Amino acid sequence: MSGKKYLIVLIVLFLSFFIATSVIFAIGDDKNSRSSLRGLKKLSVVVQIEKPAIDDFKKVGLTEDRIRTGVALKLQEAKIDVVYVEDPAMEIPILHVELNGSNRNGKTFSFLIEIELWQKSILKRDPKVEVMTGTWSTGIFGSGPASNIGNETMGLINDMMDSFVKAYQTANF
């Protein structure tokens, strides 16, 4: 392929990446990570919107409380108890939802959503050492019109929670 054709293909791929409504990447939802969901009865939900995106998300009505409420409802529908604690203890697994984004020119918004289950784990090489570690995760990176980013992002979080619930049910039923 000539240099000019290669450059054109590269530009088209680059532009299609940024024009697409959303591009999805699964980070860690497989049979190995699903086994870590077996026997899970309760979770604490922690939502974190990174700065400076927090202000942009607030402008469109997407707050940590709104996300936490939506995630908690999905968990309760799956018969997983949600524990509300200010500072979650290591004994309670944490479903961590992280949201980051960037408003470009007021027209397009790029975002990253990650949902990860953190649980107490014991190091095999030293069973006296207990740590919180991620055992299951999923994530989405994408972009879309800034005017509808709140609803679109919440819809994607709901889809990701459906994936978590499906993984949980596969491991437990």
Predicted regions and their residues:
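Bacterial N-terminal signal peptides that target proteins for export
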Residues: 1-10
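A structural "domain/chain start" motif
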Residues: 21-66, 166-173
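Bacterial N-terminal signal peptides
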Residues: 10-21
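Surface-exposed short loop/turn segments
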Residues: 82, 86-147
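C-terminal/domain-edge helix-coil "capping" segments
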Residues: 25-38, 122-173
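Amphipathic alpha-helical segments
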Residues: 63-80
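Short glycine-rich, low-complexity/disordered patches
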Residues: 31, 77-89, 170-173
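Generic secondary-structure microfeatures
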Residues: 41, 47-51, 71, 79, ...
